[in-house]
Amino acid sequence: MNLTKKIVSLAAAAALVAGAGAMAATPATAKPKPKTKGITVISFDKALAPVVSKIVAVAPAKASGTQLSFPVSKVVGNGVEHKGAIKVGAVEAKDPIIIINTETGGASVTLEIVGLSRMEVFTIKNFKIRSDDKKKQVWQGFLHLTSDPIVVAAFNQQIGAEVFKADMGLGQIRTTINK
């Protein structure tokens, strides 16, 4: 596989995984919590079921129907780190990190594309705390594909059709962090 095809394939896989990797975080002033537990669940729109069915979750990530889930591994500042990966064909994207921007109410999701580097694959709109009590904090928002034209083109190339568009809504994301 030539370098261009590999980059496009990896970017596409990352984009599909990132959605699953999107997670919640504590405010930017929070101290690192390396033993934090929790889970991020991505619920893709049912119209994307044929695409989502091509994603293979790599443990500890899990896939079920149109949902992907990733365990939270730690919270550092405004970043929520996860473990697990997804594969689409020969492309693997792993260890999603959700970076929350509390000023805008949004977040970005980056994934490490194996063989390349970490890149933003998804954005989260209206990512807010939905509940916060002594035991857990729940963040929820709307998962969108990044506006990066290279990532969008990579997704479309992976599935062989012009399905994805920049900033396209993909579904919902919910991150639960146990305190």
Residue ranges with predicted function:
Residues 1-11:
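Bacterial N-terminal signal peptides that target proteins for export
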Residues 10-11, 20-21, 58-61:
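Compositionally biased, intrinsically disordered low-complexity segments
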Residues 17-27:
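C-terminal segment of classical bacterial N-terminal signal peptides
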Residues 26-79, 144-179:
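N-terminal segment immediately downstream of the Sec signal-peptide cleavage site
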Residues 58-122:
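Predominantly extracellular/secreted and cell-surface proteins with exposed
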Residues 110-152:
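Extended amphipathic ligand-handling, pore-lining, and cofactor/metal-binding catalytic surfaces
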